[in-house]
From Swiss-Prot:
This is Serine--tRNA ligase. Its EC number is 6.1.1.11. One of its GO terms (molecular function) is serine-tRNA ligase activity. GO terms for cellular component: cytoplasm. HAMAP family: Ser_tRNA_synth_type1. Consists of two distinct domains, a catalytic core and a N-terminal extension that is involved in tRNA binding. It comes from Bartonella bacilliformis (strain ATCC 35685 / KC583 / Herrer 020/F12,63). Pathway: Aminoacyl-tRNA biosynthesis; selenocysteinyl-tRNA(Sec) biosynthesis; L-seryl-tRNA(Sec) from L-serine and tRNA(Sec): step 1/1.
Amino acid sequence: MLDIKWIRENPEKLDEALASRGIEPHAERLIALDLERRSHVVEVQCAQERRNSASKEIRQALAAGDQKTVERIKAEVEEIKTFLSSAAIKEKRLTESLEKILSAIPNIPLDSVPKGENEEANIVIRHFGTPPTFNFIPKEHFDLGQNLKQMNFERASRLSGARFTVLSGALARLERALGQFMLDVHVNEHGYEEISLPLLVRDEIVYGAAQLPKFSDDLFRTTDGRWLISTAEVPLVNLVNGEVLHESDLPLRFSSLTPCFRSEAGAAGRDTRGMLRQHQFWKVEMVSITTEEQSLIELERMTECAEDVLKRLELPFRTVVLSTGDMGFASCKTYDIEVWLPGQGCYREISSCSVCGDFQGRRMNARYRKDGDKTLHFVHSLNGSGTAIGRCLIAILENYQQADGSIIIPGALQPYMKGISRITA
């Protein structure tokens, strides 16, 4: 959530930033509503002060035996009580109206973010590896998996409907190995703390991560009003919800392996075949909680951590900085890492690393105190995929496929595969 004080002081910057995201101006409406709310608060404060002074005047009038004055002031106090009663309702309504609008406004892109309407304006900043060449036409992952008889979409559909997959045998082991490998890299070598999390969270937790109210249609909700997590970012970033930290405790770096659940309401007709876009998938997530001064440094570090996973797996990838029209709601800068998929003949997103500034910290009321400074500051938060396991499995199948349909296991994963170096039918 944005700071209304910043909006009052920078209305043009707000509207320019929103325009770069393809969103209509909001500054005038927000400032008018905020002015009405603040003016009303002043009226309430004046009424409360008058009520307090009236009590003193009543005591003085009683002492002087001036009953007429007592009755007049008592009548005035009753009017003030009536006003304050209705004023509380109005103040609540104004505050809720302001917060409703603020909660629907995305974060402000940093100046270093390229301006553009969509992914066409994204900028590639680096490559790793060279896409492999084959002496045969490379297959897509779903053909490879089904030919191996270890990837079954028909059974998954019978169990759960569209956009689910059943893996078996060595492919199921490969999926598990990827999660263990990624966690080991991030925890043992990158300094993240491993966290085991609930998969069901409450409204305020999803709101704190800036996924409510805007993305409610993309989420699954249980009958008791809780939400299945769409990413481990949601509970991880909220580990500091409502807390006051000390600067010396930061950064906090968390990593977690969880299933993720998404309705994919906005993806109708896209990637309908295979595992690229599923209602349920595994992902290793990274979250950092840090200070304003360190947040951009942390973004570069987090992105390098995600890239390191793909480098160890020797998968070709490129890293792009997203444009203002393509970046996520809570982000003020995002790097996407896109892995090469020979079967599709293109790069596809496998990780997204974002810095959110104090956007989530403000929603969560998560703050920190600096040495010698009594002022509390909202924490800055970052999140990144480290990486999406299903998409990494897809990349391994397509990049390591052989002419006979078998799959070579990357060397980094073989210790997790109990001696399996090649997957065959």
